[in-house]
């Protein structure tokens, strides 16, 4: 029963209850999640209801979600930005990765397929790893060159150093060359990101689909029109 209570699919799974101990969907998805670096608080179903000003943005994000395999297979790039914190950028990015896991689990085996990176934390860990090497971190960093889909959360949170620049550029250059998909979240508009990360990184990050969220901070209890509830996911 423990397996059933902790399964992300318990409310939508069409398999008979009780869960089988050898459920492949559960074990493969759990493996992908455990190797994704997605915070456990983001593993479950988080409903988002857009403010009226974000209706079109949510529709566009829902379209990408519904076609996430095509998005990923074609190596597309998505830049979600807003000058407001807490209005769904990170939640949407993780939703897209989770949907990808949901679509590909049956043909995945026990392999990492997507990774979530909080950019400020990752850059700090890169520097710390020089003096205090961590095999777990090195495996995470190496996976960024290989997995199908990477979320770069909170990119351009601050101006980056030359070391930070070379670290991210080497990974992104490899991913772009291999046609690997990337999702970025930021509080900086595409027009201003160059002043934070430089021209080379800016050209890679902002090249692709850009979606702006304008709504209020959902973490502080911002309300939204119930007429858009059908768009909540």
Model-derived regions, located:
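Walker A/P-loop nucleotide-binding motif
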Residues: 72-94
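Active-site signature of alpha/beta-hydrolase-fold catalytic machinery across serine-
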Residues: 95-99
């Amino acid at each position: 029963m423990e397996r059933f209570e902790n399964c992300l699919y318990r409310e939508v799974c069409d398999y008979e209850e009780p869960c089988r101990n050898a459920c492949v969907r559960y074990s493969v998805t759990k493996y992908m999640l455990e190797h994704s670096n997605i915070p456990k608080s983001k593993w479950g179903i988080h409903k988002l209801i857009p403010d009226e000003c974000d209706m079109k943005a949510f529709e566009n994000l829902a379209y990408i979600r519904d076609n996430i395999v095509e998005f990923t297979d074609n190596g597309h790039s998505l830049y979600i930005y807003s000058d407001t914190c807490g209005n769904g950028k990170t939640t949407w990015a993780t939703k897209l990765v989770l949907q990808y896991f949901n679509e590909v689990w049956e043909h995945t085996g026990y392999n990492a397929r997507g990774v979530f990176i909080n950019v400020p934390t990752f850059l700090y860990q890169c520097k710390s790893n020089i003096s205090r090497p961590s095999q777990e971190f090195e495996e995470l960093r190496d996976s960024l060159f290989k997995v199908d889909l990477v979320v770069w959360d909170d990119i351009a949170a601050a101006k980056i150093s030359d070391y930070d620049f070379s670290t991210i550029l080497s990974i992104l250059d490899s991913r772009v060359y291999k046609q690997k998909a990337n999702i970025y979240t930021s509080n900086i508009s595409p027009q201003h990101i160059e002043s934070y990360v430089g021209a080379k990184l800016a050209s890679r990050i902002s090249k692709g689909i850009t979606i702006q969220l304008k709504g209020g901070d959902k973490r502080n209890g911002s309300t939204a029109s119930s007429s858009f509830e059908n768009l909540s996911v």
